[in-house]
Curated annotation (Swiss-Prot):
Belongs to the RecX family. Keywords: Cytoplasm. Modulates RecA activity. This is Regulatory protein RecX. GO terms for biological process: negative regulation of ATP-dependent activity; regulation of DNA repair. Its main location: cytoplasm. Pfam families: RecX_HTH2, RecX_HTH3. InterPro entries: RecX_HTH_2nd (IPR053924), RecX_HTH_3rd (IPR053925), Regulatory_RecX (IPR003783), WH-like_DNA-bd_sf (IPR036388). GO terms for cellular component: cytoplasm.
Amino acid sequence: MKPQKSLRARAMDILSRQEVSRIGLKRKLAPHAESEEELENVLNEFAERNWQSDLRYAEAYIRSKSRKHGSLRLKQALAQQGIDEKTSRNLLPDRSSEKQAAIAVLRKKFKHPAANLKEKQKQARFLAYRGFDADTVQTALKHAWDENWEDSC
């Protein structure tokens, strides 16, 4: 029979694999904690030693997802993980990067421009689902198949 891992060792294992927000780490450790106080002590220690950082988590999350998702979806996902809006707003990609990402996502999913209104609405819904705002969706639909537009960004 294996000996039980300490809460501190479990936290170290989790953080050695990937960046995790404080709320995410708390959720993963909670079933193994004997008390709320013990859990908070471990979380505070890891934050003080900078082993767990919400800022690093947000940077890594945005870096990995920003090519596929828009600012609205990224902001919402970070808020669910307990990252405050000010932090997430500072890390989000700028407007031109987001428009280029929307165009890339649109071109990958749909190989040709919309032939009719129904197809255009389908493409707009797809981009909106991915978290792109209305302005970005309209720009992407308008310029996705313009070869010269990317150079002007």
